[in-house]
Amino acid sequence: MILLTLRDLRHRFVRFAVVTVLGAVVFTLLFVMTGLVEQFHREPVDTVDALGASTWVLPQGISGPFTAAAPFSTDAVAVVDADEFAPVIVGRAAVAQDGSEDVVLIGHEVDALGSPPIDEGRPVAAPGELVADDSLDVDIGDRVMIAGTELAVVGLTSDSTLLAGIPLVFTELTQAQDLVYDNRGVVSAVLASGEVRAIPQGTVATSAAGVADSALEPLDGAIASVDLVRVLLWIVAAVIIGAVVYLSALERLRDFAVLKAIGASNRSLLGSLALQAVLVALLAVALAAVLQLFLAPAFPLKVSVPTRAFWQLPLIAVGVALLAGLAGMRRVANSDPALAFSGASG
């Protein structure tokens, strides 16, 4: 039956090639959508982890520092008792340089928690300096404007974005206090590492994971929309594969009747059709795995296709292909061997 299946694929090569390409386009989009959702979930975790804190001390009543603002007095910082801690400013701003781009501004003490890993250049060492994520399209030595103040870019970091690609920029704490609040007597949060033994009244200690989760909440609607698109793409893939298997079953109905008449079992005949469906699905996924390498970099948002997608997608595709081919398999199973001796194939 394997030989019969391969011969049929060769006989109808053009059709199966077209179906494989169409399926590959659908599976390529599935790879990209999967990578997009993965990036949505990975982005806040990577960004929060890069700040070096295991605990964030925040005012009570806010969901997180990146989704709400409720500054508190710098006097409260002295109450914090932890192995290592440092105050930070978190705020939204716009960077002006050949246009304007929204950013998340982080103000931190020099060489303290909140300072990101540097990929190029050096960390912030004084007011008037800025470290930016490389997605902001600025270079070391550039001068940019934030809230009417000119800052010099001294370093670049990577993978420091939030809320679906909004870049983070980092500056010295007092500089950020002036830019965000025009008040050096307030901070947005206190970052802590290690054991936290005491926090100020009216604040709560939130884990880094909790802060990352809160930063993801504004994207819940977008993630749900992408998930819906993925479901629709799976339906399209099922229709494509199911249609070609059903047409193949109709065209080969008399052949199957002949095979039944000479003693072939339903099991072997159904296996032949199932093999066709599986081969089309696997070839389409294999082609899609290559195509997504070219599509993902051109996508407007960063796409991070997880390693697990390269084994999960083929497995799901095989399952979908078998389900989609059930109609054709049922037609074969119900075919009458007497059809082999009739003058028509219907």
Predicted regions and their residues:
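Alpha-helical transmembrane segments of integral membrane proteins
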Residues: V18-L29, I223-A243, V280-A284, A288, ...
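N-terminal Sec/SRP start-transfer signal
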Residues: M1-T28, H41, S345-G346
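Peri-transmembrane interface segments
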Residues: L36, P200-I241, S248-R254, V258-L259, ...
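Short helix-loop junctions at transmembrane helix boundaries
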Residues: G271, A281-L322, L326-L339
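Hydrophobic secondary-structure segments that place a key small or acidic residue at a functional site
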Residues: V88-G91, A96-D111, P116-D178
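Mechanotransmission and gating elements of multispan inner-membrane complexes involved in transport
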Residues: S135-D137, M145-A152, L156-L233
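Short helix-to-coil transition segments within interhelical loops
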Residues: L9, V258-R267, S335, A344-G346
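Hydrophobic, regular-secondary-structure patches
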Residues: T20, F27-D102
